[in-house]
Amino acid sequence: MANPKNEAALAELKAQFAETDSIVLTEYRGLTVAQTTELRRALGDDVQYSVAKNTLVKIAAQEAGVEGLDDLLTGPTAVAFIKGEAVDTAKVLKKFGDDNKAFVVKGGYMDGNALTADQVKAIAELDNRETTLAKLAGAMKGNLAKAAGLFNAPASQVARLAAALQEKKDA
């Protein structure tokens, strides 16, 4: 690969693969520059959305140990390198795809597994980490309150029984 532009692009892709937690591959054909800019803005700072040559993405992925993307790397491809919450990014990409029919999610890679487009869309339907933890904490709090009431019940019942016996003796 004698082309210095390709070498620089490959080095950048390798760095992004090394720093990322998950990726989503998309097809951007038919999108305007304004739509792409809108998508980048919606994705936020934790996602690097880059258009790249498929051959360079394949090489960088192989060198990073990311497997299973070869079938997805056809046609014009843009890669969303996700450094944060993958669920939030999947939600943004799904909504953008619903609003812009030219935009297509091809698939992705998360936790050592290649993902199909349907799997990425299924991830978009999940609650994010914070919401899941809040639901878990709420469920635990409710059960702990019930348990505390259950443990306190025998003591209060004994106290009421003793008070009733005292009243009966006094009468």
From Swiss-Prot:
Domain of life (superkingdom): Bacteria
InterPro entries the UniProt entry points to: Ribosomal_uL10, Ribosomal_uL10-like_sf, Ribosomal_uL10_bac, Ribosomal_uL10_bac_type
Biological processes per GO annotation: translation
CDD domains, per the entry: Ribosomal_L10
Disulfide bridge positions per record: none
Segments forming a coiled coil: none
Molecular-function GO term, any one: large ribosomal subunit rRNA binding
NCBIfam families per the UniProt record, alphabetical: PRK00099.1-1 (NF000955)
Quaternary context: Part of the ribosomal stalk of the 50S ribosomal subunit. The N-terminus interacts with L11 and the large rRNA to form the base of the stalk. The C-terminus forms an elongated spine to which L12 dimers bind in a sequential fashion forming a multimeric L10(L12)X complex.
Protein function: Forms part of the ribosomal stalk, playing a central role in the interaction of the ribosome with GTP-bound translation factors.
Family: Belongs to the universal ribosomal protein uL10 family.
Name of protein: Large ribosomal subunit protein uL10
